[in-house]
Each structure stands twice: as structure tokens, then as C-alpha cells.
From Swiss-Prot:
GO terms for biological process: positive chemotaxis. This is CheY-P phosphatase CheC. Keywords: Chemotaxis, Hydrolase. Forms a complex with CheD. The lineage of its organism: Bacteria, Bacillati, Bacillota, Bacilli, Bacillales. Its EC number is 3.-.-.-. It comes from Bacillus subtilis (strain 168).
């Protein structure tokens, strides 16, 4: 029997609430970073298959900015924070104070790359802290890696590992709202627990697997 048969909507609701708790911590950290009021929320958390994941993002050929890191500790897995080019470009322009920044220059501009690294540290650290508090598991993120590529290429490595548990990923939608500039930034977090960690995570959340 698939381990996913025992996962109920309640467990996904818990992951969404964990996301909202983490979003509160992230908003405070980003407000300090940008020196203005930031609101964040997590509209939903879903468990999606590979095909659904690609459709959800609009196709494998969509160019994206990706922040990749590993979840380590009692659970292991891959985490991706993925944004369309224009959203990442908008965030970096705000953070480095350069309205002319072009996302294509990311690899040549240390300051802009550092901005996305910091975003990854904030989002992953806040989410994993909230998840660890709820499950009583020890969790922490690795150092983030930033890349620009097509969506399908970005997640292919993580999905190859995930194929052992049925090609499903946890999607946590994140909405970041800049009150001062009335701007919204959408970031999608894809969490791909390793084979041994997927069941452990949902058991910790109360699923009967």
C-alpha cells in the first residue's frame, strides 16, 4: 500500500499552518532586511505528483530563479524556492537598491546572488523551525544554492530521488506582500523528503500510514 493512502487533508492543513507560522517569522526578518513592513502568508499546501507539479507551475520550460538547499537532521530531503524571472528580479532590485538590475546578470553580480541566498536562508530557516517545533524533530537547512534555469531542469534531480516514493512533492505556496510599495512576490516552496523521511514526516504529523 502506498504511504500516501494514509495522508489526509488534515495533515496538509497542518503543513499549511506550519507555513503560516514560518511566514510570520520570515516577514519579521525580511522587514528588518528591507527596512519596511512586510506581510507573508501561505494560501495553501498540497501534495502533488510530478505531472501535477509541472502543470501547477505552467510547464517544464518556464524560466525560473531557484534557491535550492537540503533539509538535514532527523528528516532529510531537498527544498526548492522557485520564482519566475520577473519576480526574482523585482525582489533583488528592491533589496540591493538598483532599479536597473537585470536577472540575466545574476551570475556576475555577487550582491544580487547574495540577496537570493539570504531569501533562501530566511524562508527555509523559518519554515523548518516552525516544523521542528511542531514535530519535535531536529531540522536545519544547508547552505542555499542559487541558479537560473527551466523549471523542469531545476527540479529534475530532486524528483529522481523522489521517484522511490511515488513521485510526489509537498508544495507550500508563499505570498510576500510589501506594504510600502504595494507589491506582491510569489514564491513556491517544493519540499521533496528523501525516501526514509517521507513516512517519518507524516507520522510525526499524525497520519496513520
Amino acid at each position: 500500500m502506498s504511504i500516501f493512502n494514509g495522508i489526509k487533508e488534515e495533515q496538509m492543513d497542518i503543513l499549511r499552518e506550519v507555513g503560516n507560522i514560518g511566514a510570520g517569522h520570515s516577514a519579521s526578518a525580511m522587514a528588518q532586511l528591507l527596512n519596511r513592513k512586510i506581510d507573508m502568508e501561505v494560501p495553501f499546501a498540497k501534495l502533488l505528483s510530478f505531472d501535477e507539479l509541472v502543470d501547477f507551475f505552467g510547464g517544464a520550460d518556464v524560466p525560473v530563479a531557484s534557491i535550492f538547499l537540503r533539509m538535514e537532521g532527523d528528516l532529510t530531503g531537498s527544498m526548492f524556492f522557485i520564482m519566475p524571472f520577473f519576480q526574482a528580479e523585482q525582489f533583488i532590485r528592491e533589496l540591493i537598491g538598483n532599479p536597473d538590475f537585470d536577472i540575466e546578470d545574476l551570475g556576475e553580480d555577487h550582491m544580487s546572488s547574495s540577496a537570493l541566498h539570504e531569501l533562501g536562508n530566511i524562508l527555509a530557516g523559518s519554515y523548518l523551525t516552525a516544523l521542528a517545533d511542531l514535530t519535535k524533530l531536529q531540522l536545519y537547512p544547508s547552505v542555499p544554492e542559487v541558479s537560473l534555469d527551466m523549471f523542469g531542469a531545476v527540479i529534475s534531480e530532486g524528483l529522481m530521488e523522489l521517484s522511490q516514493v511515488g513521485e510526489h512533492a509537498i508544495v507550500v505556496d508563499t505570498s510576500i506582500f510589501d506594504q510600502s510599495h504595494q507589491q506582491e512576490l510569489k514564491a513556491h516552496m517544493f519540499m521533496l523528503p528523501d525516501y526514509d523521511s517521507f513516512e517519518k514526516l507524516f507520522v510525526a504529523l499524525g497520519a496513520s500510514l
